[in-house]
Amino acid sequence: MTDKSHQCVIIGIAGASASGKSLIASTLYRELREQVGDEHIGVIPEDSYYKDQSHLSMEERVKTNYDHPNAMDHNLLFQHLQMLKAGKPIELPVYSYVEHTRTAQTVHIEPKKVIILEGILLLTDARLREEMNFSIFVDTPLDICLMRRIKRDVNERGRSMDSVMTQYQKTVRPMFLQFIDPSKQYADIIVPRGGKNRIAIDILKAKISQFFE
């Protein structure tokens, strides 16, 4: 039986790669943390749950379609969400974008009153949707997402522009159209214009603040 005193509220934020999901999640976390304290709110990125590929060569790892639901260990994520809701801590995997696999390290996460979950494929999995108290889809035009992705992956993840463009054409855009964009039908709130939509962020803050009352 779940201990209601530890009941964890899960808020899902989905959308295309480089749509502004992480910016919205980090802004909500930072501003709400100032109000309620770090012990009451946390963020979990879906990227942490990319499957372990340590058994594959680097050549094989780079061929993985990272925008397909099969690239994600949603079974483990689902298990972790259930544990947090039951008042139990989890060991969050740590994923290396350079090595294209999990590292040996984990991050200890204690249950929080509110967990903000963000990632591209969250709403494609019915089990994850069931665990969310409410969900958000960040709806940003693909051309803007591409420009942001090039800047981010080249500057922050050690990628070449050619590799980013090839991946975008082969997997990112097709998988967005096949899986991610259709999943926005499941969102409770759709946020246009990405992470700098201040009005939307204020509305979301007000909604999330209700869970701390």
From Swiss-Prot:
Residues annotated as binding ATP: 15-22
Top EC category: transferase
Annotated compartments: Cytoplasm
UniProt xrefs under InterPro entries: P-loop_NTPase, PRK/URK, Uridine_kinase, Uridine_kinase-like
Major localisation: cytoplasm
Record-listed E.C. numbers: 2.7.1.48
MF terms in GO: ATP binding; cytidine kinase activity; uridine kinase activity
Record key words, sorted: ATP-binding, Cytoplasm, Kinase, Nucleotide-binding, Transferase
Recorded metabolic or biological pathway in which this protein acts: Pyrimidine metabolism; CTP biosynthesis via salvage pathway; CTP from cytidine: step 1/3; Pyrimidine metabolism; UMP biosynthesis via salvage pathway; UMP from uridine: step 1/1
Coiled-coil intervals, chain numbering: none
Keyword Disulfide bond: no
Gene Ontology CC annotation, any one: cytoplasm
One Gene Ontology biological process: UMP salvage
Catalysed reactions, as listed in the record: uridine + ATP = UMP + ADP + H(+); cytidine + ATP = CMP + ADP + H(+)
PANTHER family with a match to the protein in the record: URIDINE KINASE
Family indicated by similarity: Belongs to the uridine kinase family.
Name used for this protein in its record: Uridine kinase
Species per Swiss-Prot/TrEMBL record: Cronobacter sakazakii (strain ATCC BAA-894)
